[in-house]
From Swiss-Prot:
Hexamer; each subunit is composed of an acidic and a basic chain derived from a single precursor and linked by a disulfide bond. GO terms for molecular function: nutrient reservoir activity. This is Glutelin type-B 4. InterPro entries: 11S_seedstore_CS, 11S_seedstore_pln, Cupin_1, RmlC-like_jellyroll, RmlC_Cupin_sf, Seed_Storage-Functional. It comes from Oryza sativa subsp. japonica. SMART domains: Cupin_1.
Amino acid sequence: MATIAFSRLSIYFCVLLLCHGSMAQLFGPNVNPWHNPRQGGFRECRFDRLQAFEPLRRVRSEAGVTEYFDEKNEQFQCTGTFVIRRVIEPQGLLVPRYSNTPGMVYIIQGRGSMGLTFPGCPATYQQQFQQFLPEGQSQSQKFRDEHQKIHQFRQGDIVALPAGVAHWFYNEGDAPVVALYVFDLNNNANQLEPRQKEFLLAGNNNREQQMYGRSIEQHSGQNIFSGFNNELLSEALGVNALVAKRLQGQNDQRGEIIRVKNGLKLLRPAFAQQQEQAQQQEQAQAQYQVQYSEEQQPSTRCNGLDENFCTIKARLNIENPSHADTYNPRAGRITRLNSQKFPILNLVQLSATRVNLYQNAILSPFWNVNAHSLVYIVQGHARVQVVSNLGKTVFNGVLRPGQLLIIPQHYVVLKKAEHEGCQYISFKTNANSMVSHLAGKNSIFRAMPVDVIANAYRISREQARSLKNNRGEELGAFTPRYQQQTYPGFSNESENEALE
């Protein structure tokens, strides 16, 4: 009997431990920087010559332009990334769509409203309004509209776009909205082929596309309703055949960015209510733990949709100086955005770093430990060198605004701002990206014994001690100590132009 009781007790504790581990996986935060749920990475890739990219082709719509970087280039394919830049003119609406891959949007300039439609979440915005008809016609009855939350965006915002979540953007300002999109094709959320696919819910892409420096081609793409039979569609949605045809976008030549003639009439709370909502959202975010692995784990006590999921913040500003992680008043500031600050990034599995370098400031040489990096120059110019595992320079040039450089994982990079300074944003293919610095506080030299450094480089102990400590407590952005008139290692323009 004692043996049976002991066996039952052992089984009980084993089950308890297993349940505890499963619950931790389900509801614990996915903040392990060494784990990244990405596919691919096994193909042979050559990163022996990097190049600065600019948009290769553009598609014009009624109220804006979509510019595509060269997704067929080996560097984009090897890193599993897809990049576009969109310009939305005032009163322009980017029609609703969703994508097979998760992504991030960086608002380079402009402001407006956007909506992300999460499945299963309630419509928390409600309004009633009276529609007035022209004189001589009777007034229609009151209509009630309700929808999910509308977000306001502005310059410097990062917007997370989970795979399969419908979204739209609207420019309600007086200046064009310019936004950079980065998508992760190798994310496990994408179970299709490693290509970017946008599923339009409205509009179409039946517009001419222009290849920069090449001939004009025709780009064809319809919205998802166009493939259904008109009668079946009208029956399924409970609308007449004419409305069904409108849904299918027949004879609609406006493209994917359309102009709203009289502007969108959007419901939004008063300023005080917005502040209250923001506070509630921050409280919910502090308590929220993203359940990224839940889809792959069986559960009988929940349906995969946490209450806080519907209120999770999908937008965060990365240019706010008060959010800087490191700041040197003579060199610049660095702001990092990862899943610990922005929990929805656990669903997207991307992160971002915004760097503002002052005049002639230099960034501590570093490598990305657990991610590829896509660097986009926002303002100013930067001298950049990238070195491979063979000690060879694979990029050596000056990046200008609008250019993008892919830096492979573990490749060492050195950046120096020119006289007007430099601002750039880098996207990392890990929700909690890590870097390892070569100089300054928390660098690898500071972590090594003096004798190791002296013997490794055949220098004296005094020289090794100076190498180890000469940047003192500086971290990230450095003020240059040794001014030179020329930089023979750099070229005025990128030496790594696109190979056409």
